[in-house]
């Protein structure tokens, strides 16, 4: 999983971009976490608790995206994916949701969060 962090020097906004199949992680980092060090630290602390066996799983529901953590992986997905479709699609049709959902290993997420934390801290 590759990623890149940028900061707009004019607006002060932070932007995370992740590799294909993990694009939604960039949106989650940029929009749901943003530069809030306390929120980033909270997720890092929860990951440590899960790794230590003190907790089985955890969920953080954001404005547009939700983070689910368990002992093995992290799942980030658009809140809209949790809703049932009101209509059925034809057999040959399907909804494209690859940019609305991503999975990664818990350690991979932890590494990316630590990098994001450092990046945000240096930008202050």
Curated annotation (Swiss-Prot):
Source superkingdom: Bacteria
InterPro entries for this protein: UPF0231
Protein name listed in UniProt: UPF0231 protein Shewana3_0655
Family: Belongs to the UPF0231 family.
Coiled-coil spans in chain: none
Pfam families: UPF0231
